[in-house]
């Protein structure tokens, strides 16, 4: 248990450093592409690290994370810090917008398709209405949830996620059952 907690502390310290870098990068958001430090990264390992960091947070909500990291070719040329922040942000949103009356179920999956790495992060949260779904990646856009969720923010998280994915020549989309 101590080793797990110490690993989480180490990961969180690293992530905090990444967050500071993210804030600095966001200041350049409109001006140009983010400065990416590209290198070969095993996406399965990176995602496993984020899942490990998130495990305690999810357990606090009686939740569980299921991972199927099935990508046979998980190595990509990417910026480790920004990709970590993208995965963290998406998983963090799943926790923030969970249904109050249900235990959180978070499913993370990787696979290869047509020579590309695919990543899916799925949850059983409150969902997003169709009319809001197409706007969630816009800068400063926030879906109004009334007083149901005490979630603070500026509507930058998913805009950052989209920017980083696009700067990596990738695509991102969101789906909801609402």
What are these regions (language model features)?
Residues 37-42, 59, 64-74:
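Conserved catalytic submotifs in the C-terminal HATPase_c
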